[in-house]
Amino acid sequence: VIWRFVQGRRSSRKAVLLLGLCDAGKTLLFARLLSGKYRDTQTSITDSSATYRLSRDKSTNVTLIDLPGHESLRLQFLERFKAAARAIVFVVDSVAFQREVKDVAEFLYQVLVDGTVLRNAPALLIACNKQDVTMAKSAKLIQQQLEKELNTLRVTRSAAPTTLDSSGGPAQLGKKGKDFDFSQLPMKVEFVECSARGSKGEEGDADLEGLEKWLVKVA
């Protein structure tokens, strides 16, 4: 009975949230998933949503929601949509990652210790975008660096926790007494390399096969 109740609550959540910093490529990725076509994008200041069909018979779909990445807006929009999230795609700029790693980890930390996210445990994909660029970091390196930064953040924040879990106590990231890794989280976390632009530029196809397979799986 409990399992059916949990499954029922999960099936009522149909949104896949696209999160990430500004210029990570969320909006182009959103457009590519929906139309397959390249389009010029600008920094978003509001959300965009659309139905994404997962099968040819159109019987399975989710609602893709692209949320702004600007620092002053992103938590506000996460607050608005987090309860509806069946899954989260956290988009990372693989080219700028080394420079932005602290900011990326900071935002991801805020997502991961959110009480609603911890309670609902939506599937999480870290989409390592812009892999068409030679200087892009690999998904493996990005995972290692994020785990290291999140572990550091956990230590520095533990002295003054500001986030409460569903029981009213301070939210704990990972397992106490152990270095953080993503396997310690209540949700399943996967990494994928992708390119919303594609290796052939504006005229070619995007490289989103791994992301598209993941969307089918979590739907």
Task: Give the ranges of each region predicted by the language model.
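Conserved GTP-binding G-domain of TRAFAC-class P-loop NTPases and closely related GTPase folds
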Residues: 95, 109-219
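Beta-strand-rich binding-surface signature
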Residues: 13-16, 49-51, 59-64, 85-89, ...
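Inter-motif core of Ras-like GTPase G domains
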Residues: 74-101, 105-118, 124-128
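Switch II (G3) loop of P-loop NTPases
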Residues: 56-77
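Eukaryotic intrinsically disordered and solvent-exposed regulatory patches
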Residues: 2-4, 36-38, 48-50, 74-78, ...
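Conserved G1/Walker A P-loop phosphate-binding module
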Residues: 1-62
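Amphipathic alpha-helical interaction motifs in eukaryotic regulatory proteins
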Residues: 30-34, 68, 82, 86, ...
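Short coil/turn segments at secondary-structure boundaries
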Residues: 30-34, 45, 67, 76-80, ...
